[in-house]
Amino acid sequence: MDEMATTQISKDELDELKEAFAKVDLNSNGFICDYELHELFKEANMPLPGYKVREIIQKLMLDGDRNKDGKISFNEFVYIFQEVKSSDIAKTFRKAINRKEGICALGGTSELSSEGTQHSYSEEEKYAFVNWINKALENDPDCRHVIPMNPNTDDLFKAVGDGIVLCKMINLSVPDTIDERAINKKKLTPFIIQENLNLALNSASAIGCHVVNIGAEDLRAGKPHLVLGLLWQIIKIGLFADIELSRNEALAALLRDGETLEELMKLSPEELLLRWANFHLENSGWQKINNFSADIKDSKAYFHLLNQIAPKGQKEGEPRIDINMSGFNETDDLKRAESMLQQADKLGCRQFVTPADVVSGNPKLNLAFVANLFNKYPALTKPENQDIDWTLLEGETREERTFRNWMNSLGVNPHVNHLYVDLQDALVILQLYERIKVPVDWSKVNKPPYPKLGANMKKLENCNYAVELGKNQAKFSLVGIGGQDLNDGNPTLTLAVVWQLMRRYTLNVMEDLGEGQKATDDIIVNWVNGTLSEAGKSTSIQSFKDKTISSSLAVVDLIDAIQPGCINYDLVKTGNLTEEDKHNNAKYAVSMARRIGARVYALPEDLVEVKPKMVMTVFACLMGRGMKSV
């Protein structure tokens, strides 16, 4: 951009800046805060030491945040690029934004971005995802009309347009999320396709994908950057599902001397993968790596990793697979990478990366490559006779998982991997207050990286502020709950806060749809019963604790009342129901609610077991959807 006064800025440049702003504004709340800047520099993979990045971010916040509210608005962002742009810091910032590799620019429009914005997408990602999906769905008869896709064309963006591939990929990542009976597979009219896309988006949201900026029309139009963004989230959830101690106890083999299981459990899946790779590298006598980008570009660490995890033929029924290390000494990086990938192919793991992706150190695709290796060949043995308290590994409850998925679907940052540990500095809770329209004064909030000394004090101050906001601004009932409880990760008391946040969010969504009608439990119950009787249905509910809800018949009837004729009653079991019947009804009900456009986070088990909190959210979401169609 040429030098110019702030007032003179062309539409093209404004569009470019909007695009750049959206890249940095990860949670799409219209502001950039310093942890989003940290993420940007991390993702841009720039050759800068950590202290330099911190310096740049401090300077950007200092120069850019002109009204000192602790965040950068779009106007302040424009100012950085114009007034500060000659400085080295602004140049580095601009470089970081442009460092999204393998970028294809194309014009695209979305309601949120201005007309004709330049959107970019990565050819490498498209190529990788197409090959992964082709393999995953190669035997699925429902996908024959689009699979196999050609990775070198735009097949992918057309293939997702009817919603079927997306629904199938969601079920591969989190089995049983979508009831197959709810997917429309024949006579695909525009209306029916719209329903499939609703089902895919609302189900993606329920497994923790951030889909706030994506509409069904974007997927139908096959907008590349949105399609790839959604697919990456779905694929990553599947790849990471088992990189978690309670689902994979052998990970305890990665414990270091003097480290407790509890400390290991706090690591994110990415950190565990790095720890896993280094465990095997150490055993091979090779140096450790610190990332899946710069440190793996020469493929040498990968050669050693493959050699360590390849089956040695010592277990029964497990054929030995020999890794040929001769390519290790190849002088050309690309040829060495190709040779390494040929060895990965022997393990059936040549996925996600091309030689060029390895050599360029593409962080996203290399992470996926390693996660897939871990899932196929973890090569870990659960430690015996060590002094380990295995009772800690209970895994999260259904309710905890639902809350976590809800938070992640709203795009909180950092991503919540472990409910209590990741809320101990209250940053996520404060972001959730913003989502429920409770203003947060970010200048009062301490943000990472926290100082080595007194880090916990900084986190505790945030927790105290979060509780104070809950009591005074949100008017939550927080009797006997203090900041210390959040900071300690007290499960019961943290859940009490989180539930009130989710409840308020659900009611807000409903009130927005119902032109501001205030919602209480009684109002929802009365609306449900009124709607059912008007539609001539015989079901009704007394309250959200009503045991008859376990059949899901009231939910199914309500969906049919909201969108007459959408329920196939041949699939619904009535009369004397077995547990399996109840579960099948509930599964169908939840998927159909999502298909008609209700963003339901609850799970079928919540209906079968009549969990009042989650039952409330189901009926509230349906009421919101019902009021929209009036």
Swiss-Prot record:
Gene Ontology BP terms: actin filament bundle assembly; actin filament network formation; bone development; inner ear auditory receptor cell differentiation; regulation of synaptic vesicle cycle
GO CC list: actin filament; actin filament bundle; cytoplasm; neuromuscular junction; stereocilium
Domain of life: Eukaryota
Listed InterPro entries: Actinin_actin-bd_CS (IPR001589), CH_dom (IPR001715), CH_dom_sf (IPR036872), EF-hand-dom_pair (IPR011992), EF_Hand_1_Ca_BS (IPR018247), EF_hand_dom (IPR002048), Fimbrin/Plastin (IPR039959)
Sequence segments annotated as region (Actin-binding 2): 383-627
Subcellular location: Cytoplasm
Binding site for Ca(2+) 2: 65, 67, 69, 71, 76
Residues recorded with modification Phosphoserine: 268, 293, 326, 339
PTM-bearing positions, type Phosphothreonine: 391
Residue ranges occupied by any EF-hand domain in the UniProt entry: 12-47, 52-87
Domain spans labelled Calponin-homology (CH): 123-239, 267-378, 397-506, 518-627
Transmembrane segments: none
Region of interest (Actin-binding 1), residue spans: 109-382
Pfam families in alphabetical order: CH (PF00307), EF-hand_7 (PF13499)
Keyword list, A-Z: Actin-binding, Calcium, Cytoplasm, Metal-binding, Phosphoprotein, Repeat
Positions contributing to Ca(2+) 1 binding: 25, 27, 29, 36
GO MF, one annotated term: actin filament binding
PANTHER family: FIMBRIN/PLASTIN, PLASTIN-3
Quaternary structure annotation from Swiss-Prot or TrEMBL: Monomer.
Protein task: Actin-bundling protein.
Protein name per Swiss-Prot or TrEMBL: Plastin-3
Organism: Rattus norvegicus (Rat)
Lineage: Eukaryota, Metazoa, Chordata, Craniata, Vertebrata
Recorded name of the encoding gene: Pls3
